[in-house]
């Protein structure tokens, strides 16, 4: 997922009472990355760490949600134990002839696996997260609608010393009366495992909530012998072959139902800034 011909950018888009912001800038400098790693008690950060990149969705009242690399890495440690059992030993055996072997397999989650689902914004008011059985209507998303705004932001990427890839990216598309966001963590450890953690966020302009769906999938490479190897490097293609290991359905309710009138979008007010 390397970015070719990269240029820093700060894109903003207004969707009714929502301000959408996508900031894309350069990889963190080594000194800054080392300092941040120390603050987070991590041996090192991903090779390509975009510490200032962010995709933010914020209401005029102040509440909202954003997606950034620093907060995503803060929850990596919680996956350490399960990763060591599921992957690290097998990876080490499969790469016993690698000169980087001892360097890569360290006592921390060296794949940066994260179940991050976003950072809630707001001081006095925040989105209220509650479990739900409601699901995103995928049929609506398949409908042909004008794309008013689209952005994709890479948050971090690491090539695992040329033995795979670990990456986190987020993209959003805005239609006339709704927006849809996908945050994707993708891991491929060559010859060992493929893992994908997806967070989908959907909001319709006349609703006082967003729907958030988190899905975790993974499979050992040995169980994917029926899949053409070239697909291993294509997240969109390999996804259908990975068994689901966890799903979480949530409703992100607005802080006050009194805001219902404020969320009705005036399509004339859907503009890029």
Swiss-Prot record:
InterPro entries: Phosphatase_reg/MetRdx (IPR051330), TIP41-like (IPR007303). Keywords: Cytoplasm. It comes from the Eukaryota. GO terms for cellular component: cytoplasm. Pfam families: TIP41. It is found in: Cytoplasm. Its main location: cytoplasm. Belongs to the TIP41 family. May be a regulator of serine/threonine-protein phosphatases 2A (PP2A) and 4 (PP4). This is TIP41-like protein. The lineage of its organism: Eukaryota, Metazoa, Chordata, Craniata, Vertebrata. The gene is tiprl.
């Amino acid at each position: 997922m390397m970015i070719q011909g990269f240029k820093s950018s700060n894109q903003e888009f207004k969707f009714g009472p929502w301000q959408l912001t996508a900031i894309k800038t350069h990889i963190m400098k080594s000194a800054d990355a080392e300092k941040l790693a120390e603050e987070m008690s991590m041996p090192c950060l991903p090779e390509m760490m975009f510490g200032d990149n962010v995709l933010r969705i914020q209401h005029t009242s102040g509440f909202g949600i954003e997606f950034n690399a620093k907060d995503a890495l803060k929850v990596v440690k919680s996956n350490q134990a399960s990763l060591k059992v599921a992957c690290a030993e097998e990876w080490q055996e499969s790469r016993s002839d690698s000169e980087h072997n001892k360097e890569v397999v360290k006592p921390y989650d060296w794949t940066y696996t994260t179940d991050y689902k976003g950072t809630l914004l707001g001081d006095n008011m925040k989105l209220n997260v509650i479990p739900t059985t409601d699901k995103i209507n995928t049929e609506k998303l398949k409908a042909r609608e004008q794309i008013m705004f689209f952005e994709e932001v890479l948050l971090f990427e690491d090539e695992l010393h040329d033995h795979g890839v670990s990456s986190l990216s987020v993209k959003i598309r805005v239609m006339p009366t709704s927006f849809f966001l996908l945050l994707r963590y993708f891991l491929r450890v060559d010859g060992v495992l493929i893992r994908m953690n997806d967070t989908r966020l959907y909001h319709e302009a006349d609703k006082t909530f967003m729907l958030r769906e988190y899905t975790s999938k993974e499979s050992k490479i040995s169980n994917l012998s029926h899949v053409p190897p070239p697909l291993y490097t294509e997240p969109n293609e390999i996804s259908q072959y990975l068994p689901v290991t966890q799903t979480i359905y949530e409703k992100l309710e607005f802080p006050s139902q009194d805001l219902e009138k404020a969320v009705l979008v005036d399509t004339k007010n859907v503009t890029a800034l």
